[in-house]
Regions:
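A conserved beta-strand-loop-helix scaffold within acyl/acetyltransferase catalytic domains
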Residues: 6-67, 96-114, 125-139, 146-282, ...
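Glycine-rich phosphate-binding "P-loop"
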Residues: 65-76
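Inter-domain linker/hinge segments that demarcate the starts of reverse transcriptase
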Residues: 81-82
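Short active-site oxyanion
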Residues: 90-94
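Glycine- and small hydrophobic-enriched segments that form the cores of compact globular domains
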Residues: 118-121, 142
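A short acidic, glycine-rich active-site loop
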Residues: 286-296
């Protein structure tokens, strides 16, 4: 069963300027656009409008600007906005996890273009769990019946904060990220209500055992889809399947509302293909990290989980210019918090 409290969640008071939210409603076509709402993010505003959100990252070889989402702007204004932004900065700009929409004009500006991973999307109108290839999802869809669990969409005031945080701590400790919350290429969970974010919780005997937070993205003032950004579940064997069950129950709600698509996010370094304008060393390192970097991030496991939904995969890109490899990877690994000290 699933209970919805959409009206309460959508009534959260806005905390930022009207113009930013207006741009977000019109130009946040990329599923990761909501990642701009986190600490350490700066904004460049173009002369004709449009915004480039970025995070300066210090390295021993100098600062690097991490541009981690597509700019918010009209498509026709994008090349000029990127040119303005590059000219305004005195340090290199490193575009991370941007779409082909951004990679194309950067290619024309002399940037090296490397695939960084594949985003997975589901068209909700025709999604189902029938057939041999979705056997695991079909099994997960009955998790609630087998284990007496329910999924509810709730405002924060109706959730036990301690239970939710306990799920996060248990989940993080079971992963190979040394208790770090990654940022920019994703965003850490916010324990509270957030503007337009949908939060679904899986309960067993009144206790939270899993939850999924869905970030919205828009185009021309209309909801384009939701991104399953934060997925957490207790690591006990009895909870296996709770995350997929939560996603599938939320998916039913989105289908009933007529939401066009659901993004499962990007699988870092997955299905990387060569590019005529790439830096070959970056592709080699990316493949090596995908194959052997599970201590830092479980790339293979994440890619496999997404593949079970039989999604449409689209490459995202890393675009670099005038930056050495050591400086580049230092900015990436420490800026995104793939590497670094413990936090929790």
């Amino acid at each position: 069963m699933l209970t919805s409290h959409v009206d309460q969640i959508k009534g959260v008071k806005l905390k930022s300027s009207h113009s930013l939210y207006s741009d977000f409603f019109n130009f946040s076509h990329q599923s990761s656009a909501y990642f701009l709402f986190q600490q350490g993010v700066e904004c460049y505003e173009g002369r004709k409008g449009g915004r480039v959100h970025y995070a300066p990252q210090k390295t021993p070889l100098g600062t690097v600007n991490l541009v981690f989402i597509d700019p918010l702007c009209q498509g026709a204004d994008l090349p000029e906005l990127l040119s303005e932004f590059d000219a305004s900065q005195c340090v290199p700009n490193l575009y991370v996890c941007v779409s082909s929409r951004v990679a194309k004009p950067l290619r024309q500006r002399g940037y090296a273009i490397n695939q960084i991973g594949a985003e997975s999307k589901i068209t909700l109108a025709n999604f189902h769990v029938h057939g041999k290839k979705k056997k695991q999802l079909r099994h997960a869809s009955h998790f609630g019946e087998r284990n007496n669990c329910t999924v509810k969409e709730l405002p924060w005031s109706e959730v036990d904060e301690a239970q939710v945080k306990d799920v996060s701590l248990a989940w993080l400790r079971s992963k190979g990220v040394n208790n770090r919350e990654l940022r920019y290429a994703t965003r850490p969970p916010v324990y509270g209500d957030e503007w337009q974010v949908r939060k679904f919780y899986c309960f067993h005997e009144g206790k939270v055992i899993a939850y999924v937070f869905f970030d919205p993205y828009f185009e021309d003032g209309k909801i384009l889809g939701y991104c399953a950004n934060i997925l957490r579940a207790r690591p006990e064997k009895a909870c296996n399947g709770a995350l997929d069950y939560t996603i599938l129950e939320a998916l039913k709600v989105f289908q009933d509302e007529g939401v066009p698509e659901l993004s499962l996010g990007v699988a870092p370094f997955s299905n990387i293909q060569s590019d005529p304008d790439e830096r070959p060393a970056i592709r080699v390192f990316s493949q090596f990290f995908y194959d052997y970097g599970s201590y830092f991030y479980a790339c293979k496991g994440l890619a496999y989980h997404k593949s079970r939904y039989r999604p449409i995969e689209t490459p995202w890109y890393l675009c670099s210019k005038d930056i050495g490899l050591v400086r580049l990877y230092w900015a990436l690994l420490f800026g995104l918090k793939v590497a670094g000290g413990r936090e929790i």
